[in-house]
Amino acid sequence: MNLSAKTVVVIAIGAALYGIGGLPMFGIPVFANTTLKPAMAVLALFSVLYGPIVGFLVGFIGHWVTDLFAGWGVWLTWILGSGIVGMIIGLFPILTKRRIEVGLFDKKDFFIFVVLAFVGNVIGYGTSAFLDTVLYAEPFTKVFAQLCIIAAGNTVLIAVVGYFILTNLAKRKKQSTHLTEAQ
């Protein structure tokens, strides 16, 4: 894997925004060690714009940053989960043939976006919950409850915030593709 300088900078910016935005002071506590983070929209945006590799690395590194600064210790299981979420949402440009880059974002694209957000959260944080149970002997009922709350909450958050961001991004891209040079 050979990443360009631009891609490395994008990953660093995305991870910093996701990591700092994921701190408890910016989240909404909903369950034991479970916080809904508006920063999930940042992860989704970087994943949609730059694809699965960037999405994975922004999620993985960003969650690591959150854990380092939050003071609750580094939970590699949940760090991996955030990486998987970013990777799955990062499939969006591939599945939509990069239509958003030419200013197209319709209901079908939004549906794909929401499904990827849900599937990403279920698989990503489902992996985290499973690994917590196996590696750390966390109670299954607790991690399953965390998974359900996170998957539902994050999907709604990503869908609502993502809709406005991606709709406006598509409008902006559409306007910039119709520019003509003054005569």
From Swiss-Prot:
Spans traversing the lipid bilayer: 8-28, 41-61, 74-94, 110-130, 147-167
Keyword Transmembrane helix among record annotations: yes
Localization per record: Cell membrane
Stored InterPro entries: ECF_substrate-spec-like, UPF0397
Record Pfam families: ECF-ribofla_trS (PF07155)
Membrane topology recorded in Swiss-Prot or TrEMBL: Multi-pass membrane protein
Gene3D superfamilies attached to this UniProt entry: 1.10.1760.20
Keyword presence, Cell membrane: yes
Keyword list, A-Z: Cell membrane, Membrane, Transmembrane, Transmembrane helix
Origin: domain of life: Bacteria
GO CC list: plasma membrane
Similarity-based family: Belongs to the UPF0397 family.
PANTHER family, alphabetized: UPF0397 PROTEIN BC_2624-RELATED, UPF0397 PROTEIN SPR0429
NCBIfam families: PRK13661.1
Protein's recorded name: UPF0397 protein VSAL_I1988
Protein source organism: Aliivibrio salmonicida (strain LFI1238) (Vibrio salmonicida (strain LFI1238))
